[in-house]
Swiss-Prot record:
Gene3D superfamilies: 3.30.2320.80. The lineage of its organism: Archaea, Methanobacteriati, Methanobacteriota, Methanomada group, Methanococci. Keywords: Metal-binding, Nickel, Zinc. Ni(2+) binds at H2. This is Hydrogenase maturation factor HypA. Zn(2+) binds at C78, C81, C97, C100. GO terms for biological process: protein maturation; protein modification process. It comes from the Archaea. The keyword Transmembrane does not apply. The gene is hypA. GO terms for molecular function: nickel cation binding; zinc ion binding. Belongs to the HypA/HybF family. Involved in the maturation of [NiFe] hydrogenases. Required for nickel insertion into the metal center of the hydrogenase.
């Protein structure tokens, strides 16, 4: 279950951002949601990622934060007909050009895992 390592990375990055805000004198109450970009070729389960994140963030300001994921399709470039477009990831084992059926293709992207942003609630009284 590689979702644990991804969830741990997200939690560590967000907690580091929280520390930076608190070092600037801003009191963080909680993190409400975290928006991610996830490439389809990572084969991550968003449901499992959310579950693991809930478990490991239990005693932090991220407790209860919702992970929201936008799935990113990999792009394909055909070296024969120069087709460029989204790759259908139904069958990851067979990568062929949808236009000319050539196997002489290059993949671009699809393995992304990025934190886009997070919604953080601050104590406005300070």
């Amino acid at each position: 279950m590689h979702e644990l390592s991804y969830a741990t990375s997200v939690l560590n990055a967000i907690l580091e951002a929280v520390e930076q805000q608190e070092a600037l004198g801003r009191k963080v109450i909680k993190v409400n949601d975290i928006n991610l970009e996830i490439g389809e070729l990572t084969l991550l389960s968003v449901d499992q990622l959310q579950f693991v994140f809930e478990v490991i963030s239990e005693d932090t300001v991220c407790k209860g934060a919702e992970l929201k994921a936008e799935m990113v399709k990999p792009k394909i470039f055909c070296m024969d007909c120069e087709f460029e477009g989204d790759l259908d990831t139904k069958d990851e084992l067979e990568v062929i050009c949808p236009k000319c059926e050539s196997r002489n293709v290059k993949l671009k992207g699809g393995k992304e895992f990025n934190i886009v942003n997070a919604t953080i609630e601050f104590d406005d009284e300070e």
